From Swiss-Prot:
Subcellular location, record wording: Cytoplasm
Lineage, uppermost ranks: Bacteria, Pseudomonadati, Myxococcota, Myxococcia, Myxococcales
Assigned EC number: 6.3.3.3
Complex formation: Homodimer.
Catalytic reaction list: (7R,8S)-7,8-diammoniononanoate + CO2 + ATP = (4R,5S)-dethiobiotin + ADP + phosphate + 3 H(+)
Protein name, as recorded: ATP-dependent dethiobiotin synthetase BioD
Gene Ontology MF term list: ATP binding; dethiobiotin synthase activity; magnesium ion binding
InterPro entries according to UniProt: DTB_synth_BioD, P-loop_NTPase
Listed Pfam families: AAA_26
Pathway participation: Cofactor biosynthesis; biotin biosynthesis; biotin from 7,8-diaminononanoate: step 1/2
Encoding gene (name): bioD
Gene Ontology BP terms: biotin biosynthetic process
The UniProt record lists the keyword Ligase: yes
Amino acid sequence: MRGLFVTGTDTGVGKTEVACALVRAARAAGLDAVGMKPAQSGHVPGEPSDAERLREASDRVEPLEAICPYTFGAPLAPAAAARLEGREVSLARVVEAARALAARHAAVVVEGAGGLLVPLTARETHADLAAALGLPVLVVARAGLGTVNHTALTVEALERRGLAVAGIVLNRTGPEDDPSVPLNAAEIARLTYREPLALLPWEPDIARRARSLGSILGAKIQF
């Protein structure tokens, strides 16, 4: 399977933005890429869900249920949200859905939920999903204070499991003036032996930010 698995160091770090930007950049370059969200939970009515945003980035080439096999109401990890509804997530079903997309498209960008070790099923985490898919993992992290520890831990967890690290992207998720931002990339590189691929700037205009991310990431990340 050709593509990327996009994980984060936490929830709210910008995984969906990055995944959508990667899909758009790939499609603009002539590669038939499609996004996938294996399981989403806590969707706020009236706002586009992560899966809907990935479908839009993919030019609506697939129905929503093909892009997102599982949807839950509670804003919890997929395994916990499924339990509340008396349901269970199947790793085999998710892998089958991803392979079906890969059979119809040149590349699949799979966006996980939360961080790498967030439980996907009653027994498996998103790390297990990345391993089952055999995809390199792109780590999306906050640019500001606290990211050095979170990012180093995530990279260490990937390496201990023998998962390929496609790179690290630091994302400014707000306009706050954080003096740690200019220093964090160097610290992460020193600890992980991996220079972050990009430091994504904050941009309040959503459309402009989407174009900016696509331009930056399209030049940095190939799959």
